[in-house]
A protein has these predicted regions:
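Secondary-structure transition motif
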Residues: 1-125
């Protein structure tokens, strides 16, 4: 898998594709529209693709909010946040007051989850 990143531009209030990373200068080139911008790397706003896609074919990135139906209990639907992990993408309940457990996203079939937003969206359906 070729690493793919996106970046939340706080100044532009939008998500942008990362087209280059310069580790020597600690900066990114982002492309929110048709004009490229160079910004300093801020890991809080940098999100890597998991390489997975939801039931609608939407690519899943760290920081995405997914709505998931559990295969064992068709009645339970939860909202989860995709969490950074050096080994494989994990998901944790969006409401951490319920539990702080995390689960391996690869364990679930794409038919069970759908991207509904990301951690920077103000409103998640």
């Amino acid at each position: 898998m070729i690493p793919k990143f996106r970046y939340w531009s706080h100044a532009l209030q939008r998500m942008a594709e990362v087209i280059a990373i310069n580790f020597t200068k600690n900066e990114l080139t982002i492309m929110p529209e048709t004009i490229g911008y160079i910004v300093p790397i801020n890991e809080e706003y940098l999100m890597q693709s998991t390489g997975l896609f939801d039931k609608n074919g939407t690519e899943i990135f760290e920081g995405d909010i997914i709505k998931m139906r559990f295969p064992m209990d068709r009645r339970f639907i939860g909202r989860f946040k995709v969490i950074k992990d050096p080994v494989s993408p994990k998901i944790g309940l969006l409401d951490e007051s319920l539990t702080t457990e995390v689960y391996d996203l690869y364990n679930y079939m794409p038919d069970y989850y759908e991207v509904v937003g990301n951690v920077f969206d103000e409103v998640v359906e």
